[in-house]
Amino acid sequence: MATTFASVSVTCWGIQFIKGFRQGALCTNPAIQTLIDYTYDFVNPQLGEQFARRILDQGADVVFAVAGPTGHGTVITTTYSQKWAIGVDDDYYYSVYGGGNVPGAEYLLSSVMKRIDNAVYGTIGDTAKNC
């Protein structure tokens, strides 16, 4: 049985990301086992590395790390271990893996981005039109 694993720091955004991840995994394979765990730290890449090693030892096939810099440590350790990972908040392929020039890039499935920049840009544009 395939196992996916999601890590998250405690934030409302993180919980929404994880719900979507779980629903997508179950839609793809109703028998899939999804495991969710929390780091309770958003700025500790070393903790993310330790977390990744622990969840990989539990058999995770895909790791979705919603945990800021802590998640960076989780994703990097996961991909270096030749397991699949999904990043969050920025395009990890460029920001973490140098456009594919860093080992492990081939195990990065995707990155989930909120694109708040688009919302801010649109709001400023709308406000400027109404002035």
Model-predicted regions and their roles:
Residues 1-131:
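A residue-level marker of the well-folded mature domains of exported/periplasmic proteins
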